[in-house]
Amino acid sequence: MLPKIEDYDQLLREFRWRIPETFNIGVAVSDAWAARDPDRVCLQHFSPDGAHAALTYGAFAARSSAFAGGLAAHGVSPGDRVAILLPKGFEAAIAHAAIYKMGAVALPLALLFGVEALAYRLKDAGAAAIITNRFGYERLVASRDELPELRLVVLAEGGDEPGTVPFRALANGVSRFEAAVTKPDDPALMIYTSGTTGPPKGALHGHRVLLGHLPGFQLHHHFLPQSGDRMWTPADWAWAGGLLNALLPSLFFGVPVVSSLAQKFDAHMAFRIMEEMDIRNAFIPPTALRLLKSVERPRQRYALKLRTLGSAGEALGRETFEWAKRELGIEVSEFYGQTECNIVISSATGLGVVKPGSMGKAAPGHQVAIIDGQGRVLPAGAVGQVAVRRPDPVMFLGYWGNEQATKAKFIGDWMTTGDQGVMDEEGYFTFFGRDDDVITSSGYRIGPGEIEDCLAGHPHVQLAAAVGKPDPIRTEIVKAFVVLKPGVAAGEETAAGIREWVKNRLSMHEYPREIAFVDSLPMTTSGKVIRRLLRQKAAAEARPSHG
């Protein structure tokens, strides 16, 4: 836990890691609280009809222990990969805690995955078991024959299918279970990378990953836990963002976590959840925050009680930061990390560590720098790759079954991120773009984030992405893919207005010379734009046609 020091520089100097010899995530987020406050509410589930449900730490600990015993009785052993293909809710949280308690490895997967994406991850991980619902089961059936290592299917709802075990039969069993004694480096969790730049890789984490998240988490939520704190995120718990930026750290600190049914993001529903469930702390990725802007005068329509608001996953940008400050009455604490090494940079609005358009400063306990291709630390103001120095408790153990990729991730003791950035004289880091996303035009290196932020501020634009399109004269030109707000007509007049908007706010070399109006943008399950697909589309357009 962070010492409650209200000065960032002093906090940075005085912070020390205290990693115990043994640590188990499942015990820390359930049994530890159940022993001292069993009636304390740990999970709440929002229902649109008002029939909200709640679960106490006592019940959470008992059910997850029973579930762990049930998995063990069905042949699941320590070290086995156990997939969780469930929506946010009590069952998913119980499954996570149970898997950690028994020393197995949790493999969270998104219900948005198609048949091939699901099969790829299950096969690559060699998953021994999967816990899913009827929707996930139907996806699984199509590829079951390709998964010889998958021995157990636990079904969380619906009738009993041949070869499956009902979730309730395991969770309602005998609750006495001797949790595995695990060390911080023992494998606990495997999350597949987003696949924004290539085939997804399984990032394997030890139990220490939760401890590694705590300083940055407390920093951007201003010394959480405070009285009345309650957490919600629209992010899927199958993503590092939803799981490690919201669910697990909150449960560790005794802060109730609110879940809601998986659905297409709806701004009004998001505000309703925050109002009805008395949400005080939220993690809302930048794309979702931009979609919230469609609701005019939100504080007049909804009684919000937000104390802290964190955002990460993509660059937030000045426009969205200023909107939240003006319309929500709160400064967003932007932070940064990736699946392999999360929350290593963070803003702390409560400590005055905030600069619109910046991701923040290095979080206590983490060494972060901008380096060149040889691993040399670059001076302030120089653009290079964001890198994190090992050892670090939040850093992954390695890529599953891919030692070559793990080695390639490091230059000496610096873990490279593949993200271009810059650090200023005050120590603030600004995201420039993925290595592959940086646009080279007329000799300029242009980060797409600033252009997208500017586009998002246009009154007619709902979402936008900028990529480089090959050009024989300029190397590349900026091409923007734009989703317009409802009711706005697509056409050259609208495109010209958007071009002028960017030209007047940024610079002549950064405005999009081409604009394509689209109904939607390709997204990962974690809400990141897959610019690679848009680049491929732009490159195909640039190639001369034959015949």
Mark where each language-model region is.
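Conserved AMP-binding A3 loop
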Residues: 53-58, 188-215
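Conserved AMP-binding/adenylation subdomain of ANL enzymes
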Residues: 211-233, 238-280, 291-295
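Structural core segment of the AMP-binding/adenylate-forming
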Residues: 73-74, 97, 101-169, 182, ...
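Conserved AMP-binding/adenylate-forming core of the ANL superfamily
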Residues: 39-97, 114-119, 166-168
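AMP-binding/adenylate-forming catalytic core of the ANL superfamily
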Residues: 113, 120, 130-133, 282, ...
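Gly/Ser/Thr-rich phosphate-binding loop
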Residues: 252, 279-283, 293-354, 367
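Conserved ATP/PPi-binding loop(s) of AMP-dependent carboxylate-activating enzymes
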Residues: 362-365, 376-408, 446
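Conserved pre-ATP/AMP-binding loop-to-beta segment of ANL
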Residues: 38-41, 154, 159, 172-194, ...
